[in-house]
């Protein structure tokens, strides 16, 4: 089931954006494009379907089928019908996902609603080109729901009050996304720089590692979960992250990937 992900206008242009700009190259061969799309489908990777190039609103979806003969791409339908109708009226989607830890971007035209295996789905033309963003250092991985990583942020409240603790939605060596309580007015604001934030990365029942980092809030938006709850989503960028901390995060990401592959093997997928 697709998840609606909506970001507010509280997005900042970071002065460090050029430092993390990723090299890329375009794929224009139809067979090679289909190869990548099939790989994304087999990995069951989520895709962010943006309504426009400069949009902050996206539907989280996945690829259901790739049909080279009909030149069609079939993707999961969104849970928010209003947003679905806006997308169908525009007939265009900007798609962002990952394949083998490489960020993938492509555009889809001629968007339509179809029936696929007894349910609604999006149909679009197979893209004419596909862009691969090569830098692996900032590969983002979704954290565990059952054993979540948490970020403790001091200095948001008075000295005699407990610090604020947020669960992580995802993490990379370049930053992380936090989630607040449903329908909460988050204390975090775009553009704010926070120091001495502690990030606890759990392992198998024990603490995997704990790091301290300075962060800048890149955006504050909302995410609508599968259960219908609307929660603040806070995108953060690490500032001058020490090499030791970066390595700990990379090891944690590797551990999560190993766990995911193990679950896929055990479930037969």
From Swiss-Prot:
<comment type="similarity">
    <text>Belongs to the YcgR family.</text>
</comment>
<dbReference type="GO" id="GO:0009425">
    <property type="term" value="C:bacterial-type flagellum basal body"/>
</dbReference>
<dbReference type="InterPro" id="IPR009926">
    <property type="entry name" value="T3SS_YcgR_PilZN"/>
</dbReference>
<dbReference type="GO" id="GO:0035438">
    <property type="term" value="F:cyclic-di-GMP binding"/>
</dbReference>
<dbReference type="InterPro" id="IPR012349">
    <property type="entry name" value="Split_barrel_FMN-bd"/>
</dbReference>
<dbReference type="InterPro" id="IPR023787">
    <property type="entry name" value="T3SS_YcgR"/>
</dbReference>
<feature type="domain" description="PilZ">
    <location>
        <begin position="134"/>
        <end position="254"/>
    </location>
</feature>
<dbReference type="Pfam" id="PF07238">
    <property type="entry name" value="PilZ"/>
</dbReference>
<keyword id="KW-0975">Bacterial flagellum</keyword>
<protein>
    <recommendedName>
        <fullName>Flagellar brake protein YcgR</fullName>
    </recommendedName>
</protein>
<dbReference type="GO" id="GO:0071973">
    <property type="term" value="P:bacterial-type flagellum-dependent cell motility"/>
</dbReference>
<comment type="subunit">
    <text>Monomer. Interacts with the flagellar basal bodies.</text>
</comment>
<keyword id="KW-0547">Nucleotide-binding</keyword>
<dbReference type="Pfam" id="PF07317">
    <property type="entry name" value="PilZN"/>
</dbReference>
<comment type="function">
    <text>Acts as a flagellar brake, regulating swimming and swarming in a bis-(3'-5') cyclic diguanylic acid (c-di-GMP)-dependent manner. Binds 1 c-di-GMP dimer per subunit. Increasing levels of c-di-GMP lead to decreased motility.</text>
</comment>
<keyword id="KW-0973">c-di-GMP</keyword>
<dbReference type="GO" id="GO:0071945">
    <property type="term" value="P:regulation of bacterial-type flagellum-dependent cell motility by regulation of motor speed"/>
</dbReference>
<dbReference type="InterPro" id="IPR009875">
    <property type="entry name" value="PilZ_domain"/>
</dbReference>
